[in-house]
């Protein structure tokens, strides 16, 4: 879709000025013009995937953050390479024996035996000799140990990132992968929809994770969920007053269990924190609490029954009922009867109720500027604006229209 302005009297002047101020550099992208066709040059850097990671060394071969099987595969391969470097260093640092000629002991004696004869002669195996390590072997071993340590350390950082309940890189890659599917494209299984976005920097990632950790810490402080240590040492969750620890039969709390539970409580809550399931659980609990309050007070059997049903409906339709909130004019969102046992299922159901995205996909804007005539018109001024002669050429016919101004 494009807009081509109609030609006017200033076209020639514009062409002359464009020729004088013409830029010699070629544009990256442009559209067709009446003067000619401009070639679009694609930036080759946009064809190279730039998936972020903490410690992977694969560069453009790094898979997308939302492709967990590929990420674990590359991490395992990097760990295997690091272990191979350690084995290389161990081989070069190990003492290698010097090959010797086979020693033959007298008959009846072993190689490592030692005995004195009548001639006071002693037979024993010669001492084992080893090759001396050169400086080159030591340098290669140190370099191999350093490289292997860096590879394994980077793999550990990547595993720690993938174990986080909230990973901005994962959410970003997953969002644009789904966006590409909605637009009719098929994103790459390994690299994702890397052509749709520029991954966020490490500084932005660190800022988002820090804010998430702060919010989790605040929620943990005010959360009423308690983690109780059972007799077998396992932690279980329960709803009750703030306080942790195993209470024995005498009603006293064990000091060791209390200390262990105090340490385990924030760790369990951060590790088991879900994204969408927890949001759904909070909404469900809030709705259940509100429903019980309404049924116990405003919607009890005394106020709501079949005898006053017609009166209640009339007040609701007229907007005079106490149950009508004038500030609320938005219907509730129903998630339907779809199964929501996991985060993926809940997210799939939730994405079906995005009105702005649906409106964007269903709406097609097409703007057309319709001129007064289908062909070029020539306007001539006669007698200082009092008489206009319009010459219109359309379909091979020529008409002269004379209009007098009042």
Curated annotation (Swiss-Prot):
Belongs to the MGR1 family. Residues 27-36 have a biased composition (Polar residues). This is Mitochondrial inner membrane i-AAA protease complex subunit MGR1. Component of the mitochondrial inner membrane i-AAA protease complex. Keywords: Membrane, Mitochondrion, Mitochondrion inner membrane, Transmembrane, Transmembrane helix. GO terms for cellular component: mitochondrial inner membrane. It is found in: Mitochondrion inner membrane. The keyword Repeat does not apply. Pfam families: Mgr1. The chain crosses the membrane at residues 69-86, 138-160. It comes from the Eukaryota. It is a multi-pass membrane protein. Component of the mitochondrial inner membrane i-AAA protease complex required for mitochondrial inner membrane protein turnover. The keyword Transmembrane helix applies. Residues 87-137 are mitochondrial matrix. It comes from Lodderomyces elongisporus (strain ATCC 11503 / CBS 2605 / JCM 1781 / NBRC 1676 / NRRL YB-4239). Residues 1-68, 161-406 are mitochondrial intermembrane. Residues 1-36 are annotated as: Disordered.
């Amino acid at each position: 879709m494009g807009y081509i302005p109609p030609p006017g009297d200033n076209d020639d002047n514009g062409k002359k000025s464009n020729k004088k101020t013409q830029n010699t550099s070629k544009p990256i992208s442009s559209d067709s013009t009446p003067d000619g066709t401009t070639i679009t040059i694609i930036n080759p850097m946009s064809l190279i995937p730039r998936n972020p990671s903490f410690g992977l060394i694969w560069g453009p071969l790094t898979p997308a953050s939302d492709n967990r099987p590929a990420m674990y595969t590359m991490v395992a391969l990097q760990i295997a390479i690091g272990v191979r470097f350690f084995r290389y260093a161990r081989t070069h640092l190990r003492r290698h024996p010097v090959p010797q000629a086979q020693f033959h002991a007298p008959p009846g004696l072993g190689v490592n035996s030692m005995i004195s004869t009548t001639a006071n002669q002693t037979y024993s195996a010669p001492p084992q000799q080893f090759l001396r390590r050169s400086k080159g072997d030591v340098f290669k071993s140190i370099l191999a140990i350093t490289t292997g340590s860096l590879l394994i350390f980077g793999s550990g950082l990547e595993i720690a990132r993938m174990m986080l309940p909230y990973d901005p890189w994962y959410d970003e890659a997953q969002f644009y992968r789904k966006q590409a599917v909605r637009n009719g494209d098929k994103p790459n299984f390994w690299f994702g929809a890397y052509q749709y976005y520029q991954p966020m920097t490490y500084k932005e990632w660190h800022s988002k994770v820090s804010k998430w950790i702060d919010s989790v810490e605040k929620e943990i402080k005010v959360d009423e969920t308690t983690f109780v240590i059972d007799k077998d040492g396992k932690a279980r969750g329960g709803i009750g007053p703030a306080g942790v620890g195993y209470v024995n039969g005498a009603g006293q709390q064990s000091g060791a269990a209390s200390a262990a539970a105090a340490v385990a409580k924030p760790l369990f809550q951060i590790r088991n924190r879900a994204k969408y399931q927890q949001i759904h659980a909070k909404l469900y609990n809030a709705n259940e609490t509100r429903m019980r309050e309404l049924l116990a007070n405003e919607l009890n059997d005394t106020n709501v029954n079949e005898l006053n049903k017609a009166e209640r409906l009339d007040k609701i339709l007229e907007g005079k009922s106490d149950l009508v909130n004038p500030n609320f004019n938005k219907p509730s969102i129903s998630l339907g009867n779809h199964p929501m046992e996991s985060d993926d299922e809940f997210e799939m159901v939730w994405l079906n109720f995005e009105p702005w995205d649906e409106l964007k996909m269903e709406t097609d804007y097409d703007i057309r500027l319709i001129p007064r005539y289908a062909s070029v018109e020539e306007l001539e001024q006669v007698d200082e604006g009092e008489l206009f002669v319009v010459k219109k050429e359309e379909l091979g016919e020529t008409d002269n229209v004379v209009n007098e101004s009042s």
